[in-house]
Amino acid sequence: MKILVTGGAGFIGSHTSDRLLELGHEVVILDALTPPVHRGGVPPSYLRPEVEFYEGDVRNEELLRNLLRRVDAVYHFAAYQDYLPEFARFSDVNVVSTALLYQIIVEERLELARVVVASSQAAMGEGVYHCPVDGEQLPGMRPESVLAAGHWDIPCPECDGPLAMQATPERIANPQNPYGMSKLGQEMVAVHLGRRYGVPTVAMRYSIVQGPRQSVFNAYSGACRIFCLHYREGRIPTLYEDGEGVRDYVNVDDVVDANVLVLQDDRAIGNVFNVGGGVPVSTREFVEVVMRQYGSDCPARVPGEYRFGDTRHILSDITALSKLGWSPRRTPADSVAAYARWLEDIEELDGVLDTANASMRSLGVVRKVSQ
């Protein structure tokens, strides 16, 4: 097949493109090469020469229409992710581009084998918790006043008792930030229009994806990037809150395995799938993995800072995708080792950490507990 990969010069998109080429498919990439992922408007050197590359915006109707007419399937990875309060841009890039994609498919009566849309674990927000008294709970975003007082764990909204984190299934949709809201909107556009108009669609809710090619320039996202850059430079990273917040890390090669599976397996059509690591890992545990990779005995600092809007815990339930035969095979240590090796060949690292830290503080993302 000839397959269009939007955002194909990025992290997940480029790895997926590589695998598709290895499987004998032809790959067409559409990417705007915009910051913070890319700098200088130049395609990254890791792109394979076999790909047919177009620099352009996925919202460019004429360009997108011309490309869609020539392909048999689509992976839609192009997205906007940041912590800036650009609410309209989140929806415009993530939701409107997806609506345009389906509009063209329907108008042109294109018979595509598959459209795979990249969603995010952020669509689930804090996810699902269990209270021994009141049962399942879906807490909202933690109030600023609570975080400023240094209270991290979420009490039951009904009885104020303790809550236990649960693995969150796909039926839960409770986004708490503009990015998560836009990804849920994207899911709804893709899955519902796909069902209505007979477009074989799959939406993939990725957890925190780790591995080589994750941009070093994104100030907000990427625990692997942040911690590896610190220890590589002999600096000590910061853990927010108490370092015990749980995250769900998945290796990019496992993600690619899942992406290829849903292209090939018709049982995936019309569904949303969580794509996660399946194992809860605290931020403190993850930074210890990075410490071991760099042979450091200097633990991260815990200075009583937090990022307003962060979830306390989140773990995706990957049962649904596992029923199709997929399971994550790589560990966080595998991801860290691969990323650390990749960093050795990156030359543009001077000032990256300082710029990112300054940006986070100037925007008020990082805040201190009240004394």
Spell out what each predicted region is.
Residues 66-70, 104, 230, 258, ...:
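CheY-like receiver
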Residues 39-42, 126-131, 214-218, 286-288, ...:
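Short aromatic-enriched loop/helix-cap "lid" or pocket-rim segments at secondary-structure transitions
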Residues 233-371:
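C-terminal substrate-binding subdomain of Rossmann-fold SDR/epimerase-dehydratase oxidoreductases
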Residues 98-99, 184-191, 224-228, 257, ...:
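Conserved active-site helix of classical SDR/Rossmann-fold NAD(P)-dependent CH-OH oxidoreductases
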